[in-house]
Amino acid sequence: MATVTDINQSQTSRVAKVKPSSTDFMEVGSTGLNQTAGIVNDDFLRQLQGKQAYANYREMADNDPVVGAMLHAIEMIVRSVDWSVEPSNRDDPRAIEEAQFISTCINDMSTSWDDTLASILTFLVYGFSYHEIVYKYRNGYTDDAATRSKYNDGRVGWRKLPIRAQDTVQRWDMDDNGGIRGMYQMDPHAPDKGLVYLPIEKCLLFRTTTKMNNPQGRSILRNAFVPWYYKRRIQEIEAIGIERDLAGMPVAYVPPQLLSNNASADERAALSAIKQIVRNIKRDEQEGIVFPLAYDPDTKLPAYDLKLLSTGGRRQFDTNQIVTRYDQRITMTVLADFLLLGHEGIGTQALSVSKIELFLTSLNAYLSNISETFNSYAIPRLMRLNGVSEELSPALTYSPPKNIDLEGVAKFITSLAQAGAPLFPDQDLENYLRGMAGLPQGQAEEV
């Protein structure tokens, strides 16, 4: 009776097959990305559009100590991560063999894996990084760099994944729906090569975000630009103020005739020279001024004079607090404000741990981005070049970075032991705890 009911239900729930329309299998709209002829101008700040954006982001990364510390911390953590290649099916010998093959390809490139990761990580600064895939035949230790390999199996492997610098991007090749077909590169240091086209099938594109399929992603420093911009100018004003406080503010006294509208050409030239002297006064090992000595015939006072006015007392604003505030804003934009804990005399251990864990969580997303790009594009393409089914494509994986609180783990285990939990002897648990602490694995006792 139940069987009849199930059959009747399946028959009544079946609907007539609808014929798809002509537009169901085609893309009608577009992403809406603000781009013209492949030139992306999606940011509303003019300073962060085109080549000027690359220059500003590079200045932030190379000149600002706080931004540099954030990026250095990210790179060092990524370099310390353990990467591995997992087979698509652990029970299939062919899948295991292909996983081993990809692992050898990663370690057989002319550029080390760590250095390759370092160049990939520039996508954090600029929003994207574009890498050309250069293949090679693995023909052992030959004199030809195009075929030199640690392995002599004749298979196609990766020779290198060189970056194509972000500031050499001339424009993108995009279809009518916003899909990315490739990139046109113009290297200013190799103008003879002209405009070079790099199709997306031959490259890997790493991005912080795929919003609106923007090929340039979004720099992690984007939200830090405004506080960095004001911080840099406040530091410049601060340096000028310090110099003026130490050297004094120069004041030049000149005859009124030099400042009048009917001053002669010689008088205007003299005034211009005196202004230049005032602007260039600095305290250094070559300090000194040559100034005319002349007296007013009526007052018998010097017609020309130069004085340095010193300022007394404190300024109305504490620039140190202002710069510190902007430093905090900069680190907060990438969840790295734990770097400043202790510098301001505030912060607790618990707060530090929670902030570091939040930072590592965000970093884990970037690592996932890198591995997904390899798993979706680089590895399947290499499989096809070697005539291997993509079903056997292995996956590039990594061990997520963790902030292990060994003291907290020790207290937790102690509490379990005091509660009567049977923890030891347990060789697996012991080895796991040893691994957390970076200690060598223990030897199981023979029975």
Question: What residue spans do the PLM features occupy?
Answer:
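C-terminal anchoring/interaction modules
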Residues: 1-28, 269-308, 388-447
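Structured, contiguous alpha/beta core segments that scaffold functional sites
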Residues: 2-68, 72, 76, 88, ...
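Short acidic (Asp/Glu) and glycine-rich catalytic loops that position anionic groups and cofactors
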Residues: 76-81, 244-255, 300-311, 338-339, ...
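An acidic- and aromatic-residue-enriched active-site/binding cleft used to recognize and process polar
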Residues: 90, 136-138, 294, 311, ...
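Cation-handling catalytic/transport regions enriched in His/Asp/Glu
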Residues: 91, 95, 307
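Short His-Asn-centered micro-motif
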Residues: 252-253, 291-293, 333, 342-343
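Ordered, soluble secondary-structure elements with a strong preference for glycine-centered loop motifs
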Residues: 264-268, 313-321
